[in-house]
Amino acid sequence: METQDRTKVNKVVDAIAASQKHLLSIQNPDGYWWAELESNVTITSEAVLLHKIWGTDKTRPLHKVENYLRSLQREHGGWELFFGDGGDLSTTVEAYMALRLLGVSPTDPALLKAKSLILAKGGISKTRIFTKLHLALIGCYNWRGLPSLPPWVMLLPDNFFFNIYELSSWARSSTVPLLIVFDQKPVFKIDQPINLDELYAEGVNNVRWKLPKNGDWSDIFNILDDGFKLAESLNFVPFRNEGIKAAENWILERQEVTGDWGGIIPAMLNSLLALKCLDYDANDPIIERGLKAVDNFAIEIENSYCVQPCVSPVWDTAWAIRALIDSGFAPNNAPIVKAGEWLIEKQILDYGDWNVKNKQGKPGAWAFEFENRFYPDVDDSAVVVMALYQAKLPNEELKKQAIDRALNWIATMQCKPGGWAAFDLNNDQEWLNAVPYGDLKAMIDPNTADVTARVLEMLGACNLSIQPNNLEKSLDYLLKEQETEGCWFGRWGVN
């Protein structure tokens, strides 16, 4: 071997050893790994709004949020969804709102720059529905410009062509509480209220409080919305009280012991807002747990405070195990054993929302987070199975039972086209992405190439099998999904 080649090999070996050492140094004593899940600034901005509404802002280090937001403002004056996007309008409006709520003057140079970008992009009237919702909660937008969500939606039977279980898990856990919020249309009184009239490009007195039209078939939803609004104005909303009560019960049933809802901040914030609308007190244990759960998603350092959209210990732990073993670390080494046993403890043996559409499956999956009983997912479960398969644990029989449970659950989650989705079975009614409320186009959870590929990777890597016909169907699905350039679409990121 040439000296130059030997040097390169040594550098690679040293890099692997250093990486292994680093991974081991950040393992939690309980056995798991957990790193920050980065996001744009809307999550933290909305957390500021939540605490202002509940009056709990003085008990959190929210003054550090100002530093966090200022550090991420770009030269063009806006805040971005991804690097170099030129400034996202809705994200920038929410960051501006949060800074104003934190006491920053509208004449502050940072806000003046943000204001210029906001107005250049059309102002508040051009923002997404959820941004308008958050502004409406404190009187900075008119509820007339938001779509109606009749609470009787909660009462639609599971076998009806549309019901809450036709929404993706994240849309469902966020929307059910909003059935209460949109019905009540609250304007909460907060300490040191603000107005954002300066952010209406057309002038606040010239705003048309109407949903935008697309000029296609989806405009039928605008007509329906006009009907819902007329019914509200006449105080004729069928089964209104029953729907609100059903939504309230649904929320309470799905709160984890740790206070979480759905494992994601939007569901947690919306659930807390819904309960605020129903006059729950800040000292109620349900609310205290919910606010504490939001705190648990926060990252505080010396001069900064932000809130993650979600936490990822199960995902991080599975990948850490695989990385260590793949790089030569002994699969029966103590850190691997501890991590593997922690993962087995985290296997979810309760039925969740997935069971509504999947009557055949039995529990045995994993979720992304520490606690999320109702929403395990296929992607995490497949990665955990691969990690456990590689690890050598003292109780191999217990490990085998965990893997078998997961395999059986995953097999029952195969969708009709042949692929796998993340959280649900056959959750694919595309028309839902056309409703005015769903302007983020994320209302459903169809099968995707990346999750399907993960399942096939698991089957091959772990020498596992499913019904041959189902395997062939999944391969056919993947081949059909390949794009003309040769690539596949990655819904769940570059994974």
Predicted regions and their residues:
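Preference for long, amphipathic alpha-helical scaffolds in soluble/luminal domains
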Residues: M1-N495
